[in-house]
C-alpha cells in the first residue's frame, strides 16, 4: 500500500507538470524570467577614490542616470584601480601602493568597507541605490578619501550600519576587502589601462568603454533588448 501511495504521488506530480507545460504556464513563466534577465545589464566599475576621471564619471554619468536606469542595471563597484598589493607571508599584513598615494588607499578601503556593509545588511532591492548614493556622495566631496563616514550619515544609513563601516575601516577586514578588489582587478587587466574601467555583462571591450565614458545611458539603452526606460528616448541618450 505504501509503495502504491508513493507511485501515485509521483504520477500526480508528473501529471501536474505535464498539464502546466501543455497549457504554457511554465514556459510563460520561464519566458518572463528570461526576458527579465535579458533586460538587466551588469555593470562592473573599476575605479579609484582620488582619480579625477573616476570622480567625474561617477558624479556626472552614473549618479544622475541611476534613478531611471536602476531597474535595468546591476552595478558592482570595485575601488582599487591601478594600485598594487602584496604580503610577505600568507598570514602577514597586506601592503598596498596606490596611484595617488596613501590617502587614496585609505579612501579605497573606506569605500570597500561601505560597499561590503551595505551589501551584507540590506535587501537586494535596497543595497544598490544606497551603494550608488554613498559612493556618489564620497566621490563628489572635497576629500573623497575621508568622506565615507559623513556620507554614510548623509544618505541615511542606520547607526548600526555606520558603526559596521567604522569598525571595518579600523580593522584588518578593510585590508582584506581591498586585496580582494585587487585580485578581481588584476584578473581583468593588470594593470588597468584606464581608470575608471567599465565592463558590461562581464566582458571588456574598448567600444563599450569609450561609450560608457562619453554617454553611459546611451550604452545601457543599446544593450537593453526589451522594455526600455524613458531616458532612452531623451536627447542625452541619443547624442
Region spans (language model):
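Structural alpha/beta surface segment adjacent to cysteine/selenocysteine redox centers
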Residues: 39, 44-49, 55-155, 235-238
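C-terminal cap of thioredoxin/glutaredoxin-like
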Residues: 2-5, 40-46, 141-239
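Sterically constrained small-residue positions within well-ordered secondary structures
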Residues: 34, 66-68, 189
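N-terminal signal peptide
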Residues: 2, 14-40
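Eukaryotic intrinsically disordered and solvent-exposed regulatory patches
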Residues: 30-31, 61-62, 182-186
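Charged/polar interaction segments and conserved charged motifs
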Residues: 3-4, 18, 22, 110-115, ...
Amino acid at each position: 500500500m505504501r509503495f502504491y501511495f508513493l507511485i501515485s504521488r509521483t504520477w500526480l506530480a508528473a501529471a501536474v507538470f505535464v498539464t502546466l507545460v501543455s497549457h504554457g504556464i511554465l514556459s510563460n513563466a520561464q519566458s518572463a524570467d528570461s526576458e527579465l534577465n535579458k533586460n538587466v545589464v551588469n555593470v562592473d566599475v573599476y575605479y579609484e577614490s582620488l582619480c579625477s576621471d573616476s570622480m567625474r564619471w561617477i558624479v556626472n554619468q552614473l549618479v544622475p542616470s541611476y534613478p531611471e536606469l536602476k531597474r535595468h542595471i546591476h552595478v558592482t563597484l570595485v575601488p582599487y584601480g591601478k594600485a598594487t598589493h602584496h604580503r610577505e607571508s600568507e598570514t602577514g599584513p597586506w601592503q598596498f601602493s596606490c596611484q595617488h598615494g596613501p590617502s587614496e588607499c585609505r579612501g579605497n578601503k573606506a569605500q570597500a568597507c561601505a560597499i561590503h556593509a551595505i551589501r551584507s545588511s540590506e535587501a537586494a532591492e535596497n543595497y544598490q541605490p544606497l551603494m550608488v548614493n554613498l559612493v556618489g556622495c564620497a566621490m563628489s566631496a572635497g576629500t573623497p578619501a575621508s568622506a565615507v563616514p559623513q556620507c554614510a550619515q548623509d544618505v541615511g544609513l542606520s547607526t548600526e550600519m555606520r558603526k559596521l563601516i567604522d569598525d571595518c575601516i579600523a580593522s584588518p577586514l578593510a585590508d582584506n576587502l581591498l586585496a580582494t578588489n585587487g585580485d578581481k582587478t588584476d584578473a581583468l587587466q593588470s594593470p588597468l589601462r584606464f581608470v575608471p574601467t567599465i565592463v558590461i555583462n562581464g566582458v571588456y571591450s574598448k567600444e563599450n568603454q569609450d561609450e560608457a565614458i562619453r554617454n553611459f545611458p546611451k550604452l545601457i539603452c543599446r544593450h537593453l533588448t526589451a522594455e526600455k526606460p524613458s531616458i532612452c528616448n531623451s536627447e542625452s541618450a541619443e547624442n
